[in-house]
């Protein structure tokens, strides 16, 4: 039987890292690094990728607009009993979460800021494979299917509130795969073409059904 080569560590770049889902993922990643067996039995997919990705090599970074600390966010959301995560406070304090791009910036400038953040994350976690996880809130239907290129897309994004798209453009053009956990549609033709061009996958849709709508 052909042996399976273990992959590099995984770096989850979470847009919305201090939300209820993002902060819980941060705790889980911290727990996996120290107490793997406390977490794995509760994951339905635990055995599916065990030979590919060591569970204790999953790291978290990302962005959020909240000025609260990640620890305060975990505490406020009350998803996890405090006894479960207090042992990982020091680990949570080490998780690097960047500020979101300032809203007065043009869409292109916001993307450039995020691209710079991604470069810095890669330097911080040398050898890890980054993946963007979109946990931003639902923003309603935004039709961008008529945009023919990134320039058109940037122009259109000037008049709509769709921050997910800036993160997606930054990730795809940086060679970073995208997992969309929100109900917002990211797979517009321009983005699909860029993903093909940069050879990166985009997957997922609406992992928070019941919360976003």
Each model region followed by its residue ranges:
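Metallocofactor- and cofactor-centric catalytic cores in central/energy metabolism, strongly enriched
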Residues: 2-182, 186-197
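Extended amphipathic alpha-helical segments with heptad-repeat/coiled-coil character used for oligomerization
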Residues: 204-213
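Accessory, usually C-terminal, subdomains that scaffold auxiliary metal cofactors
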Residues: 198-203
């Amino acid at each position: 039987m052909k042996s399976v080569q273990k992959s590099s560590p995984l770096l989850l770049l979470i847009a919305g890292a201090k939300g209820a889902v993002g902060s819980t993922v941060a705790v889980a990643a911290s727990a996996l690094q120290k107490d793997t067996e406390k977490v794995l039995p509760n994951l339905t997919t635990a055995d599916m990728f065990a030979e590919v990705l060591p569970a204790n090599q999953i790291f978290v970074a990302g962005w959020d607009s909240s000025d609260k600390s990640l620890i305060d966010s975990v505490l406020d959301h009350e998803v996890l009993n405090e006894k479960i995560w207090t042992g990982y406070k020091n680990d949570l304090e080490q998780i690097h979460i960047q500020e979101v791009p300032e809203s007065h910036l043009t869409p292109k400038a916001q993307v450039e800021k995020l691209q710079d953040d991604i470069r810095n994350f890669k330097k911080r976690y040398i050898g890890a494979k980054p993946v963007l996880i979109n946990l931003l809130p639902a923003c309603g239907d935004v039709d961008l299917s008529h945009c023919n290129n990134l320039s058109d897309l940037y122009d259109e994004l000037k008049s709509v509130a769709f921050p997910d798209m800036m993160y997606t453009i930054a990730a795809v053009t940086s060679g970073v795969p995208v997992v969309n956990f929100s109900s917002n549609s990211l797979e517009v033709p321009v983005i699909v073409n860029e993903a093909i061009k940069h050879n990166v996958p985009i997957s997922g849709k609406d992992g928070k059904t019941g919360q976003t709508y």
